[in-house]
Curated annotation (Swiss-Prot):
Upper taxonomic lineage: Bacteria, Bacillati, Bacillota, Bacilli, Bacillales
Protein's name in the database: Ribonuclease P protein component
Role this protein plays: RNaseP catalyzes the removal of the 5'-leader sequence from pre-tRNA to produce the mature 5'-terminus. It can also cleave other RNA substrates such as 4.5S RNA. The protein component plays an auxiliary but essential role in vivo by binding to the 5'-leader sequence and broadening the substrate specificity of the ribozyme.
Source organism (scientific name): Exiguobacterium sibiricum (strain DSM 17290 / CCUG 55495 / CIP 109462 / JCM 13490 / 255-15)
Keywords, alphabetical: Endonuclease, Hydrolase, Nuclease, RNA-binding, tRNA processing
One annotated GO biological process: tRNA 5'-leader removal
Catalytic reaction annotation: Endonucleolytic cleavage of RNA, removing 5'-extranucleotides from tRNA precursor
Amino acid sequence: MKKEYRVKKDKEFQAVFTRGASVANRQFVVYALKKEQQTHFRIGLSVSKKIGNAVVRNQVKRYVREACQLHEASLAPNYDFVIIARNPAAKMTAQEVADSLRHVFKRSGVWKRQVK
């Protein structure tokens, strides 16, 4: 995922937290903030130290980025997303992460269409 497609600055994270809508399941919390001027969605990740050691946290982040790339065509383009991983995400495979995130994105209303 390209760096311009990531939410990186603290101000951007805080804007998504305060003005964005949140949807959650057991594995992830997703905050979504609509940005009309954007042509592509951006992703910010937060994985707590409670999830596990650095290896586990980095693996969860890689799986989330991979899932977002996989579902890139199905996500609304003009949103900033902040994805917070919960404890069960540490024991998930890449496919399970992708399925869980798809479920959360569908519930939040930013899913455009089915990917085959």
